[in-house]
Amino acid sequence: MALLQIAEPGQSPKPHERRLAVGIDLGTTNSLVAAVRSGVAEPLPDAQGRLILPSAVRYHAERAEVGESARAAAAEDPFNTVISVKRLMGRGLEDVKQLGEQLPYRFRQGESHMPFIETVQGLKSPVEVSADILRELRQRAETTLGGELVGAVITVPAYFDDAQRQATKDAARLAGLNVLRLLNEPTAAAVAYGLDKGAEGLVAIYDLGGGTFDISILRLTRGVFEVLATGGDTALGGDDFDHAIAGWVIEEAGLSADLDPGSQRQLLQIACAAKERLTDEASVRVAYGDWSGELSRATLDELIEPFVARSLKSCRRAVRDSGVDLEEIRSVVMVGGSTRVPRVRTAVGELFGCEPLTDIDPDQVVAIGAAIQADALAGNKRGEELLLLDVIPLSLGLETMGGLMEKVIPRNTTIPVARAQEFTTYKDGQTAMMIHVLQGERELVKDCRSLARFELRGIPPMVAGAAKIRVTFQVDADGLLGVSARELSSGVEASIQVKPSYGLTDGEIARMLKDSFDYAGDDKAARALREQQVEAQRLLEAVQSALDVDGERLLDEEERLAIAAQMDTLRELAGGSDTAAIENQIKRLSQVTDAFAARRMDATVKAALSGRRLNEIEE
């Protein structure tokens, strides 16, 4: 008799057989793939022994060239060589046009405003370009490990919004990868350091890569990595340092800033090389065309100071959001190649009052942490899976009457999470409701970001306020949002997986947070005004409806005129901006209609009891 093989969900049916899973750091400038081998997480090399894969793709008519050779061709073939594609992930065409000087491509608009890059191989979306990089990493891993991968943990900046995360998952699917988890880059770094050091306490993760900056404040306790707060800038990184140096060269050499794409790429490569050499040297000679000059580390520090200051501002905000003091943070983990710049390390050390941790190569630490988590999720470490408590960077909510933003999940809420809230109809007989999903910190819809819209139909006709619609927001472990709405009496339901066509523009998250603090007082006043205006409109409609049905029957002319006068006054005030006056007039109209409401109730009760015996009523 054959025995049925039974295995735990996610575990191998062969207990001694390891399931091959990898961690991938899909970076703006460089990418890596790592795996746990013989109990140690380590980056996987290519055939030439190189660990780092430049995030560059050069398109030929029949094939795609990925990595070092593609990056080397950027100056001679700029239109067909795509670099820093991470900056384009989840963005719309209007957003990427703002980066035109930094990304000299020929863009075309595709469906849902998605940008496409013109190449000799045809139009390529950022998702397709990222997929080519991921495919190269997958092939490297399968060759090195000698088998097919069961999945990968792919890291993303903590500040990536829903669109950017979804774009990353789509790229992985195109590359033939099963995504076990999208992991925030700072959390991945904490995994690497937490396991290696057995660290506990409050830790800051300062992650400055080629194109993005993240700062996260974490509490590490016995294998639990809790993100207390996160911040950063989706358009700040080492690329900005390169552009600052390039600008200095143009100014010193007296060149025109309007360079052709090939010359621009060549100048940026020279700038990047100078930046890297200044990590170990006090000054370097920079040559471009017929010009050459001396660039000192002190001059570099001056050039990049505005960018360093921007990162420190985000750090202070994240510390404040976490509810802890700077002095309580006992260590700072440095992540990303741009943290090798001496001025960056010095500035971070001065802010936090401690020597930054650089034990693990900052280029490798994220991939190593992702590999450790991938190994656990693949079922190779029973009983040792880490509990990772990430957070959402901006509040999620929906639009209510009057253009108000009702927050359902506040920012810095730990994910995965599900929250529900009940809403009701605004008008009598309303049978449908538009659900408008929003992201942001402001009180008014116009100041927040629209994520998605969907409609709940089939609501039973009822008087305004009688229907109960439960709206549930669910954010999964990857930070992706789903929203459902259900009318409780009938059970009719509608839902949506939020997949916006493009993400937040440069610095928009930081701006949204800043605005929420700067305009907090104004926003509350505006919200209070809108709420009173909505209540005034609701009361006016309810009174008018009652007058149309019972006014002639239950009121004399003097009473009708008195109510009409108060209604006219409320209509006039509701069109203004005096919140207190509207509130007081609502009270006056309510008072003048109290007797009318009581008579309507008496008439309704009398009609209900008419023709029935006393014993029938008592029963």
Swiss-Prot record:
Pfam families: HSP70. InterPro entries: ATPase_NBD, Heat_shock_70_CS, HscA_NBD, HSP70_C_sf, HSP70_peptide-bd_sf, Hsp_70_fam, ISC_FeS_clus_asmbl_HscA. Keywords: ATP-binding, Chaperone, Nucleotide-binding, Stress response. The keyword Chaperone applies. GO terms for molecular function: ATP binding; ATP hydrolysis activity; ATP-dependent protein folding chaperone; unfolded protein binding. One of its GO terms (biological process) is iron-sulfur cluster assembly. The keyword Metal-binding does not apply. Chaperone involved in the maturation of iron-sulfur cluster-containing proteins. Has a low intrinsic ATPase activity which is markedly stimulated by HscB. Belongs to the heat shock protein 70 family. This is Chaperone protein HscA homolog. It comes from Pseudomonas aeruginosa (strain LESB58). The gene is hscA.
